[in-house]
């Protein structure tokens, strides 16, 4: 029986402060009920061991007794239910966060971030599996991540999810109604999920963390209403309101158009955190002045994408100028630079904005985006082109814009396979999974001598070089004399 694992889980909850000693009997009985057990014999000792090991034992036992199906989705739904029993109620969490915020906003977010890991909402043991490294490029050190923390669904689970009834609740993965939700085959459980109310621009928003943590304290700030993404004056106001309340965090918004936006356009949200991306470190390569806003520092950032950086001690002035630039960009056409505000009534121009505090001043980075497509580039002219799709085909959203590549899990095994062939020989084109990398690998072999000792590191740096090219493709005005001249034409038109 799993009595020891139950006792170990209670011990874990006590050590992490999820429950107190007076909660022990109540929590034990709730766990027994969920596990389908009518009684238990508490062991005399508590073993301090990793949460992953405790939960695995409980899941294996429940599956063996027929309490749950033994597939990844069912196991994730069930262990979240177990952890939800031990997770304090929202009122308790909010009260503790606000108490700490009164002392220091950073103390509050530090506590909440650790809490979200202790509840297993952020599965530390899965995040640790991600492959992460930095790659030196002409634009600074870019961050590369092969995301392995999202569980791979097995074919049976995928089929079951497809056959399951489509519910309209919660409306999406970002809705506040996910807090405490039991989940289903096609929607993750969130009994251990907690969100913190924040007011920005007189609206009710909520702070939470991403369960996949692409970077340190990767947070999501979500609208309390299920409303679509929209970039406008209010967006700039909200971003600056947020960094005013949490000055140790940056925050940004994905663009509001397909191709150049993120994966979720249906729910208005921002992403932020406590991390310094390569784009933030990038210097201003040319200062510019916007007429009527001489009090605002402005310049073009040395970055592969087209970035205007604004800085001022008065956040209201930043909002005014950012709106001015956005309005101008939405209506801007420059045929010589292949920039079209719209074609056939479809708008193409928008902005990816990022806000932060720097040396006591407010700072806004405005990244100019355009989602036009052509026969030659059906996925987008300012999107990674076909020759880069073997590494990155997905949308270039906020996180990538700032210099962090979130790459698909398939690359873990594929890069290992490419390394083997580069070191020991072989024909990549004869392997269905690796054939897509063949042209790239042949080009690399002409420049490097690969050995068992250096292959992994060389490939990592070359993946970084590909990502730098991805960002160059996504840049509207290129880092060439002609591109910078076109960039200045837009700035002078504002």
What are these model-derived regions, one by one?
Residues 217-223, 261-277, 363, 367:
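Histidine-centered divalent-metal-coordination microenvironment in nucleic-acid enzymes
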Residues 1-221, 225-228, 304, 319-322, ...:
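Active-site microenvironments that recognize anionic phosphate/pyrophosphate groups
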Residues 192-194, 224-251:
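Helical scaffold of the NTase/Pol beta-like nucleotidyltransferase catalytic core
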């Amino acid at each position: 029986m799993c009595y020891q694992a139950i006792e170990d889980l209670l011990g874990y909850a006590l050590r992490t402060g999820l429950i107190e000693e007076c909660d022990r009997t109540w929590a034990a009985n709730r766990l027994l009920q969920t596990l389908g057990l009518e009684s238990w014999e508490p062991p005399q000792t508590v073993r301090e061991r990793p949460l992953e090991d405790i939960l695995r034992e409980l899941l294996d036992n429940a599956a063996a007794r027929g309490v749950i199906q033994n597939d990844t989705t069912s196991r994730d739904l069930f262990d979240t239910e177990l952890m939800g029993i031990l997770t304090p109620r929202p009122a308790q969490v909010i009260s503790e966060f606000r108490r700490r915020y009164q002392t220091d906003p950073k103390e509050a977010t530090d506590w909440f971030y650790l809490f979200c890991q202790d509840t297993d909402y952020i599965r530390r043991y899965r995040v640790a599996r991600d492959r992460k490294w930095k790659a030196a490029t002409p634009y600074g050190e870019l961050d590369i991540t092969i995301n392995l923390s999202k569980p791979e669904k097995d074919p049976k689970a995928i089929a079951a999810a497809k056959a399951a009834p489509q519910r309209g609740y919660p409306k999406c993965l970002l809705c506040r109604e996910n807090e405490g939700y039991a989940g289903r085959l096609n929607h993750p459980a969130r009994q251990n999920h907690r969100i913190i109310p924040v007011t920005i621009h007189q609206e009710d928003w909520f702070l939470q963390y991403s369960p996949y943590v692409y970077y340190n304290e990767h947070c999501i700030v979500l609208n309390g209403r299920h409303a679509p993404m929209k970039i406008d004056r209010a967006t700039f106001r909200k971003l600056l309101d947020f960094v005013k309340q949490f000055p140790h965090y940056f925050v940004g918004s994905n663009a509001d158009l397909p191709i150049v936006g993120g994966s979720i356009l249906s729910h208005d949200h921002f992403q932020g955190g406590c991390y310094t991306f390569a784009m933030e470190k990038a210097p201003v390569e040319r200062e510019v002045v916007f007429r009527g806003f001489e009090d605002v520092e402005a310049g073009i950032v040395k970055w592969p994408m087209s970035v205007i950086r604004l800085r001022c001690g008065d956040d209201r002035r930043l909002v005014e100028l950012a709106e001015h630039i956005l309005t101008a960009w939405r209506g801007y056409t420059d045929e010589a630079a292949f920039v079209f505000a719209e074609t056939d009534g479809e708008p193409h121009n928008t902005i990816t904005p990022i806000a932060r505090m720097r040396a006591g001043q407010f700072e806004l980075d405005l990244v100019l985006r355009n989602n036009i497509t052509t026969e030659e580039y059906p996925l987008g002219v300012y999107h990674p082109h076909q020759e880069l799709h073997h590494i990155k085909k997905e949308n270039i959203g906020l996180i990538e814009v700032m210099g962090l590549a979130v790459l698909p899990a398939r690359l873990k095994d594929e890069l290992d396979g490419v390394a083997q062939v580069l070191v020991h020989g072989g024909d990549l084109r004869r392997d269905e999974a690796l054939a897509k990398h063949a042209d790239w690998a042949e080009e690399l072999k002409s420049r490097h001598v690969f050995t068992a000792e250096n292959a992994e590191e060389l490939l990592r740096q070359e993946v970084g070089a590909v990502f730098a090219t991805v960002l160059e493709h996504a840049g509207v005005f290129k880092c060439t004399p002609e591109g910078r001249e076109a960039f200045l034409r837009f700035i002078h038109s504002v």
